[in-house]
């Protein structure tokens, strides 16, 4: 409603009231007010009276109170309507601006003001003749302070002030916005409340009932609102001026539901009496009271203690009635609240002024409410005739009972509470100016809205609660009452009001409707009792709807949201709904629905997606429980929602803002649940509401309540002196009749309204707002509720929530104590009570704890959902007195609020808060808030993150906090005086169910006690042991939950822990168990999550925070802010825990539990490494095979809890994969990588040093420079990995494989930098590999000699890995984590590698371009020569290559892949490959064969080397990308260079079928074949380049079949079944690679001399590879490639690692073979255009101009070799990628491969093109029989043909597309190549998709097919050709292609198919 800004200014300064936005323009409000008043009774304003004050030394002797009046909801509605209609939009808008109203807060007796007759509550109209309208509070203060000795004030006497008479509801707002209120001094209300005309219905459709003005403004005419938002004048209230017992116009329900089961909640500010005939009502009241309490209480206390007292009396009087199951909310005379027929709230009678109606109910008999329920309405006001009371406070109290349980001052207090966030309100005003303007009244409106619909539909109980709350708490107070239900509802309404506001408010109403808000929100219930549910829904909802809207907007406290919810034009006022439920006394199922409703509302709150949505569901839920009405409610809620919701939301937000700054924030949060959390105040509500979406119904209510609670607590702090009164007032709200649903799921409807919550949260100033219900009354209600709760203890979570007032704020400690029996959840003193109120929510809370925060607080003891309350606290800034209890609550909330971020956290926080709040309520709120049981400076460190994760000391630093224990809340302040608003992390920690013990293991500090609550675990260091024990004792005393054994448990725990302390002084790790035990206890008691300690809502801080914390672990936290900052990090690092205190994972090495042998080594590392060494040295793929994620996570959690219990013999420690993954995970999660962040760049740079020795020395120096823990751990780990690598023969984990696994994990930066991951991956691999290989040297003082050797190997590795890694990275990217090899540590590796194209990428792209160019040239050449002699030695080649070295193996794999691909491509390719193989391998192969296939053969050979290059590239994703990019070209090239395709195929075949022979052949034929090979390489390179762009992998496969193929093949083999092959073994040995590489290269060199040169280089490389292989398979594999390319070496290193794994090798080999074949086919197609470009590029990169086949290639031979090496490396990466992709498939393929590489080739070929394979086969034959020189000649012939044929081939391919047949493949060398290319490509294209689809199936085939698809797809014609040929060949090869991608085993089928083709 109105934000109360209470400024405790000195007499003079008291004037500092910001009346900042008293928009005169909100005079449209005049209409609403006027209508309302006129309808009820014309206001006759005597006019302002002028008081002249003389300044004295003491000033003027008065202080001012600043209320921001937000535009009434109706005004907002009008404004919306007008805006929609184009009418007075501007005026409306202005009207909607929040208006500053300044009231006399205090008049010093004997002071000038006192003598002049200035009275408390007088509203300042003019200062020295200047109107305050439009002036900000500060401006008015300035005017006063700047006045001369004489100050002339024009004041509107409080009793005559419309705003005050109206109780700051709708009408108050309207009046505030009307000129009458300020200027015209219209006829003042006659002193009698009854005579007080209802304020003009600014926009209050519910104007008919005057009470709506303040308490019930929105709901007063909900029908009007829903019917016509402007129906303010609609006499919804039968007697607008009377008690507003008016039946809601729309459907005066024939049956007073409330009567039948009325929980009459008389919401008196002082006495929020709720006659709760049923538990429902009681629950409502208590919940409501809780919420209402803080905001109203503060206000009440501020403005009228006596009033509170009278109210208190009333409350007590009514309290008994509360227990009465009367359906009537007796409208008792001014001090008392009675149940009225309408039921819970007098609301039934008063739509216009719920509060008044309620208060009237209190004051009058049940029927009386109709007469004077609303102060807003003349009735209410007249019912409470200020003249009848001796003291203004009495009058206010009584009037509050009648009007809305709020006097102007009360409202001002609540406004001030909101006003405290005046800025926030203003802020929100922009967002929801209308809302703000109305927030005060809207708060109520809102409550009714939510309440109406919700109460009605889902849970009558909640409705009643909401209604009561709505009605009673006009702004804050009403909010308090309705707040519980409205609270969540309101916040939802607020922010989601547009969408879900109504539903939410309805929910609030549902929970709190029956409860008269202290503001008289009961009125909102007004005639609800008289209405049928449907009628209520319609009429009440309509009127309340508007009212609710108004209330929601004006008094966010009001749970008017339901009416809003009932967006159908019925504005089921939340009260009406609640009233109905109140009246109806919801049956148990209905009660349950109420809870559900609340829950839904909570969800709605938490779900920004739409209040309307939630509202609807809420309503629906209610309808489920409430029968039809709920359904109706839902409709109205949704329908009106649109109408009111939209209008409402802003006003509601403002309302809430007025009520609470927090609420205002909350409003935003409503719109965005996150926002809820964002705002310190609002977040508690919003966060609670927003975050626990699952419990939306209950949570929503809870949230709202929470905020009010926070506010209230704040207010309490502010009004500690007034605490009792506040509590009393709050008690009114607490009196919310919250009937527990039979299901026991009491919705937290009684939660305070958001406005109330906002007021409370804003509280610094708005403490008063919360004080509307006397604590006594509230306590009585609470007691009853508690009794009910106890009775239904089985459902304490729901019931306690419903029963426990969210913000009980017991004014009198005695009452609180009385209620103490009531479970803490029931008797949460101001804040605690709130939490218990929330107790009802816990079930929902678990879903969305934040929403339930408040309810959780109530419920907390049972369910422990304090997070909601905590949220409000943390998010809400309250006055200090409010803070006292609520700050705890708030602090808890802050902590909880953080928790709120996660349901788990919220849940825990809520529980904690709940306990705390329970305790607070139990002790008195005054005790809690005004009195700190203990306070002092303590060093504080959270042990558990918000997410429930344990945090290491390093994660969260110690901070010195001023700790104040109030009641059950422990508040942490940065400094003594900061208590008003602890930071969000300093939210009060609820100690209700806490376990406190001395902490020994958590920290090294002394005198540290650990406080374990349901939602947090923290350490406090006292100055000395005595202080620590005193704290422990005090906390223990405060920790008992009211009705739970938690306190005893806590004491026992403390005693036990103290004993343990003595026993565990030296034991650091046992305590974690104790904390866990305590957690268990806590969990058991509070229902906290399991493992709260480790999973406590604190999540690990960021690493920086962690570092700070770890550094400061022993020192007290120096900066609380820092600590807070760390919380998010902690949350992020949830899983990074220290084993002992904070877990093992995610904590710094120095924080990890040390190993027993070496304190610098983490225990986990020691254990895992030892276990692996004990059991896993012979375990194949150890560290590469990932463990079960669930098992790993489970073990991580256990280890994080503490490593003391580690039982290595446990079965869970039996899984070596899990253990190895655990180790990798540990290093991966290190906040500071093993190679520290600051050294990372140095390591990378050192690794890149060209001088091997220098590199090693630099690395060694850097290693020795590492921190001790890092150095020792690295040393230990390196030794371990070295040990593992030493067993690589069995475990297949060579240093390279281990490096691949651990490199990215160990060598990394804390921040995930994809660029680094990509560009540095080779370096990471190499560094780790180097460490493994030279561990002894690195970790010894001297080792220069060894570094040299190491350097050589390293250099080899380097040159190879870089390109390989780039490609590997690419492949990894493609493959993702599929390769088991890379899986664990490689998870990051693969992830990183995905993007690690950085440096390698550039290189690779160059290679691709060059390769493409080469490939193009090669294809051109090949096309004529492309036919290769089929060679049966393909398998041999594969075997040989695989056997050779790792490098060769990789090459073989590539070749094999190429061969497979060739086979897949078709027989032609196979023939070509065979020819190549023959040529390369078997010089003796008939030249005829070569000649026949010569054209293809030579080209194939040439393409083959390019293919190797390409293959090297192809492994990289870039290859695929290139393929995609160039696919059109490449397809063309492929078409044109079918021979090249064949060449790649032949290369593949060579590598596959005759790797050994090929190697030998290459060696033998190195001379002339080398020339050919040079040419062939050039072609292949061209093709490869082209392919690499299009399908570099394929080309590379073909070319690299011989060169890179071995490596790739090795990789493929290692991945595939090839792993079983001799090759893989040989590769492991390192032998095959050399031979393979050499033979490979020579095979290609047969094509050209340049190729020879290239082959020579390759051979050299091979030799190096051999050496390396001998030294290390990886090294060897790389060795052969090393000389050619360092970067490639690096890539190769990683490739080798993969390669080393037999499976990976096999797979990569197969995959590469496939890729090669496909790539060749594609390359040939692409070659024409791309090949040239790529050749050129590649020339620039590694090869000369391939376009000049002979000379250029010979020149290029080296570059080509390098390029090819790079390609090979790429192929290798590809192979690794293949391995990744098809480990399993490769295995299957491996079988096939083992059976015969040829089969694979055939299969691959079949996939690509049976024809191609046939051609390849011919090539093989020719190669075998023919000489390579003949191939060279053929190549030369083909070259010219190729250039010509590039075009002709394209055409030919087009033709071939049609022809595509096996015969095509075998056609003339030129023709066949072309044909082959088309058909092969067609097949390849087709196959490629298949292969791509089946990438996992066969690495090589996958690569090939993938490359090919890339190529084939872009060029449609080639694709078509491919498609046709594929169709033709596909028939033969498609099955193979399809299956083959899955398996190479399909090779037989494809082979068979190929044979037919042949």
Swiss-Prot record:
<dbReference type="InterPro" id="IPR001478">
    <property type="entry name" value="PDZ"/>
</dbReference>
<dbReference type="InterPro" id="IPR011993">
    <property type="entry name" value="PH-like_dom_sf"/>
</dbReference>
<feature type="compositionally biased region" description="Basic and acidic residues">
    <location>
        <begin position="1441"/>
        <end position="1466"/>
    </location>
</feature>
<feature type="modified residue" description="Phosphoserine">
    <location>
        <position position="625"/>
    </location>
</feature>
<dbReference type="GO" id="GO:0030054">
    <property type="term" value="C:cell junction"/>
</dbReference>
<feature type="modified residue" description="Phosphothreonine">
    <location>
        <position position="1516"/>
    </location>
</feature>
<dbReference type="InterPro" id="IPR041489">
    <property type="entry name" value="PDZ_6"/>
</dbReference>
<comment type="function">
    <text>Functions as a GTPase-activating protein (GAP) for RHOA and CDC42. Downstream partner of ARF1 which may control Golgi apparatus structure and function. Also required for CTNNA1 recruitment to adherens junctions.</text>
</comment>
<protein>
    <recommendedName>
        <fullName>Rho GTPase-activating protein 21</fullName>
    </recommendedName>
</protein>
<feature type="modified residue" description="Phosphoserine">
    <location>
        <position position="616"/>
    </location>
</feature>
<feature type="compositionally biased region" description="Basic and acidic residues">
    <location>
        <begin position="1477"/>
        <end position="1493"/>
    </location>
</feature>
<keyword id="KW-0832">Ubl conjugation</keyword>
<dbReference type="GO" id="GO:0000139">
    <property type="term" value="C:Golgi membrane"/>
</dbReference>
<feature type="region of interest" description="Interaction with CTNNA1">
    <location>
        <begin position="1592"/>
        <end position="1861"/>
    </location>
</feature>
<feature type="modified residue" description="Phosphothreonine">
    <location>
        <position position="1682"/>
    </location>
</feature>
<feature type="modified residue" description="Phosphoserine">
    <location>
        <position position="1527"/>
    </location>
</feature>
<feature type="modified residue" description="Phosphoserine">
    <location>
        <position position="881"/>
    </location>
</feature>
<comment type="subunit">
    <text>Interacts with GTP-bound ARF1 and ARF6. Interacts with CTNNA1.</text>
</comment>
<feature type="modified residue" description="Phosphoserine">
    <location>
        <position position="1115"/>
    </location>
</feature>
<keyword id="KW-0488">Methylation</keyword>
<feature type="modified residue" description="Phosphoserine">
    <location>
        <position position="1432"/>
    </location>
</feature>
<feature type="cross-link" description="Glycyl lysine isopeptide (Lys-Gly) (interchain with G-Cter in SUMO)">
    <location>
        <position position="1444"/>
    </location>
</feature>
<feature type="compositionally biased region" description="Polar residues">
    <location>
        <begin position="1918"/>
        <end position="1931"/>
    </location>
</feature>
<feature type="modified residue" description="Phosphoserine">
    <location>
        <position position="1504"/>
    </location>
</feature>
<feature type="modified residue" description="Phosphoserine">
    <location>
        <position position="459"/>
    </location>
</feature>
<feature type="compositionally biased region" description="Basic and acidic residues">
    <location>
        <begin position="13"/>
        <end position="32"/>
    </location>
</feature>
<feature type="modified residue" description="Phosphoserine">
    <location>
        <position position="924"/>
    </location>
</feature>
<keyword id="KW-0206">Cytoskeleton</keyword>
<feature type="compositionally biased region" description="Basic and acidic residues">
    <location>
        <begin position="1624"/>
        <end position="1634"/>
    </location>
</feature>
<keyword id="KW-0343">GTPase activation</keyword>
<feature type="compositionally biased region" description="Low complexity">
    <location>
        <begin position="1383"/>
        <end position="1401"/>
    </location>
</feature>
<feature type="modified residue" description="Phosphoserine">
    <location>
        <position position="1099"/>
    </location>
</feature>
<feature type="modified residue" description="Phosphoserine">
    <location>
        <position position="1917"/>
    </location>
</feature>
<feature type="region of interest" description="Disordered">
    <location>
        <begin position="1"/>
        <end position="42"/>
    </location>
</feature>
<feature type="compositionally biased region" description="Polar residues">
    <location>
        <begin position="306"/>
        <end position="325"/>
    </location>
</feature>
<keyword id="KW-0333">Golgi apparatus</keyword>
<keyword id="KW-0968">Cytoplasmic vesicle</keyword>
<dbReference type="InterPro" id="IPR036034">
    <property type="entry name" value="PDZ_sf"/>
</dbReference>
<feature type="compositionally biased region" description="Polar residues">
    <location>
        <begin position="1349"/>
        <end position="1362"/>
    </location>
</feature>
<dbReference type="GO" id="GO:0005886">
    <property type="term" value="C:plasma membrane"/>
</dbReference>
<feature type="region of interest" description="Disordered">
    <location>
        <begin position="418"/>
        <end position="458"/>
    </location>
</feature>
<feature type="modified residue" description="Phosphoserine">
    <location>
        <position position="1418"/>
    </location>
</feature>
